[in-house]
Amino acid sequence: MTITLGQSTKNDKDLFDTMDDWLRRDRFLFVGWSGLLLFPCAYFALGGWFTGTTFVTSWYTHGLASSYLEGCNFLTAAVSTPANSLAHSLLLLWGPEAQGDFTRWCKLGGLWTFVALHGAFGLIGFMLRQFELARSVQLRPYNAIAFSAPIAVFVSVFFIYPLGQSGWFFAPSFGVAAIFRFILFFQGFHNWTLNPFHMMGVSGVLGAALLCAIHGATVENTLFEDGDGANTFRAFNPTQSEETYSMVTANRFWSQIFGVAFSNKRWLHFFMLFVPVTGLWMSALGVVGLALNLRAYDFVSQEIRASEDPEFETFYTKNILLNEGIRAWMAAQDQPHENLIFPEEVLPRGNAL
């Protein structure tokens, strides 16, 4: 009986192993399995947006000009939402609405659903890319977790909110001025600025900006001197073994300024991660609430007193009047199919207007 020891010369790699080797190969631009989702979706989302803002009108959906071809500029061009009558249709090119006609598909607002869906999956692909790379180089996945916050905001605003309303029509169009108009709509119809979830979101974003400014300035203030390193490209050497700045000095400085300071870098940087991510998550949760038409804070006692006493007015009651004005003007403009007509006598009046 003979036993042969050794490796088989037969190549046992299957198709999956071959693809895995190619996708995760060390190259200038990492592809990875996540790239199969990220790159095509990002390409189609950006391509659809550039196509729409360059050529496609919103006349048939909003009664507006929205492309460079019609005279818009970068701030006023947009890929606008489908008409309200199309409700929540996916508006597939081969669907019953467009029936394979590309021109009709563009007129109906098909580019919006195209850009929104590919954009959402592109963002998810980018988050998965961070997970994949972190796993490959044995890092923890906090970058991907942090990026989940803007994804949550995007999905809640562009998908969850219009799904709770009557159609995609009530989502934001993809354009600068269009987003501004959507913000005004949110304020007028939902009193968004007085929503506690919006307040948490603003606190998170502005708090994160403050933390970044303080952290960057503190690091610059407490850099260790390293000879000529600050004046040469040695200052950018990514493999230095020593610390870049003095945490002890920074701690003493802020202890004297505020009376309290971060005692270690782990807690400091976790806090810088926690503040903006939690703020954005809370904003996304608030938008989900708006999809269900949940109300913001209402100070009804002030409204009742203001209606009875012409000399009593607060910033809150002034804002309520402004919201009523926004609703009165926007409803008639945004929903012409409803034939909404507001006589002069029912339009809001007050010091705010």
Swiss-Prot record:
<keyword id="KW-0472">Membrane</keyword>
<keyword id="KW-0602">Photosynthesis</keyword>
<keyword id="KW-1133">Transmembrane helix</keyword>
<feature type="transmembrane region" description="Helical">
    <location>
        <begin position="153"/>
        <end position="166"/>
    </location>
</feature>
<keyword id="KW-0408">Iron</keyword>
<keyword id="KW-0604">Photosystem II</keyword>
<dbReference type="GO" id="GO:0009523">
    <property type="term" value="C:photosystem II"/>
</dbReference>
<dbReference type="GO" id="GO:0045156">
    <property type="term" value="F:electron transporter, transferring electrons within the cyclic electron transport pathway of photosynthesis activity"/>
</dbReference>
<feature type="modified residue" description="N-acetylthreonine">
    <location>
        <position position="2"/>
    </location>
</feature>
<feature type="binding site">
    <location>
        <position position="269"/>
    </location>
    <ligand>
        <name>Fe cation</name>
    </ligand>
</feature>
<keyword id="KW-0460">Magnesium</keyword>
<dbReference type="InterPro" id="IPR055265">
    <property type="entry name" value="Photo_RC_L/M_CS"/>
</dbReference>
<keyword id="KW-0813">Transport</keyword>
<feature type="transmembrane region" description="Helical">
    <location>
        <begin position="125"/>
        <end position="141"/>
    </location>
</feature>
<feature type="binding site">
    <location>
        <position position="143"/>
    </location>
    <ligand>
        <name>pheophytin a</name>
    </ligand>
</feature>
<dbReference type="Pfam" id="PF00124">
    <property type="entry name" value="Photo_RC"/>
</dbReference>
<comment type="function">
    <text>Photosystem II (PSII) is a light-driven water:plastoquinone oxidoreductase that uses light energy to abstract electrons from H(2)O, generating O(2) and a proton gradient subsequently used for ATP formation. It consists of a core antenna complex that captures photons, and an electron transfer chain that converts photonic excitation into a charge separation. The D1/D2 (PsbA/PsbD) reaction center heterodimer binds P680, the primary electron donor of PSII as well as several subsequent electron acceptors. D2 is needed for assembly of a stable PSII complex.</text>
</comment>
<dbReference type="GO" id="GO:0009772">
    <property type="term" value="P:photosynthetic electron transport in photosystem II"/>
</dbReference>
<feature type="binding site">
    <location>
        <position position="130"/>
    </location>
    <ligand>
        <name>pheophytin a</name>
    </ligand>
</feature>
<dbReference type="GO" id="GO:0010242">
    <property type="term" value="F:oxygen evolving activity"/>
</dbReference>
<dbReference type="GO" id="GO:0009535">
    <property type="term" value="C:chloroplast thylakoid membrane"/>
</dbReference>
<dbReference type="InterPro" id="IPR000484">
    <property type="entry name" value="Photo_RC_L/M"/>
</dbReference>
<feature type="modified residue" description="Phosphothreonine">
    <location>
        <position position="2"/>
    </location>
</feature>
<feature type="binding site" description="axial binding residue">
    <location>
        <position position="118"/>
    </location>
    <ligand>
        <name>chlorophyll a ChlzD2</name>
    </ligand>
</feature>
<keyword id="KW-0007">Acetylation</keyword>
<comment type="similarity">
    <text>Belongs to the reaction center PufL/M/PsbA/D family.</text>
</comment>
<feature type="transmembrane region" description="Helical">
    <location>
        <begin position="41"/>
        <end position="61"/>
    </location>
</feature>
<keyword id="KW-0934">Plastid</keyword>
<dbReference type="InterPro" id="IPR036854">
    <property type="entry name" value="Photo_II_D1/D2_sf"/>
</dbReference>
<feature type="binding site">
    <location>
        <position position="215"/>
    </location>
    <ligand>
        <name>Fe cation</name>
    </ligand>
</feature>
<feature type="binding site">
    <location>
        <position position="215"/>
    </location>
    <ligand>
        <name>a plastoquinone</name>
    </ligand>
</feature>
<comment type="subunit">
    <text>PSII is composed of 1 copy each of membrane proteins PsbA, PsbB, PsbC, PsbD, PsbE, PsbF, PsbH, PsbI, PsbJ, PsbK, PsbL, PsbM, PsbT, PsbX, PsbY, PsbZ, Psb30/Ycf12, at least 3 peripheral proteins of the oxygen-evolving complex and a large number of cofactors. It forms dimeric complexes.</text>
</comment>
<protein>
    <recommendedName>
        <fullName>Photosystem II D2 protein</fullName>
        <ecNumber>1.10.3.9</ecNumber>
    </recommendedName>
</protein>
<dbReference type="GO" id="GO:0016168">
    <property type="term" value="F:chlorophyll binding"/>
</dbReference>
<feature type="transmembrane region" description="Helical">
    <location>
        <begin position="208"/>
        <end position="228"/>
    </location>
</feature>
<keyword id="KW-0157">Chromophore</keyword>
<keyword id="KW-0148">Chlorophyll</keyword>
<keyword id="KW-0812">Transmembrane</keyword>
<keyword id="KW-0560">Oxidoreductase</keyword>
<keyword id="KW-0479">Metal-binding</keyword>
<dbReference type="InterPro" id="IPR005868">
    <property type="entry name" value="PSII_PsbD/D2"/>
</dbReference>
<keyword id="KW-0249">Electron transport</keyword>
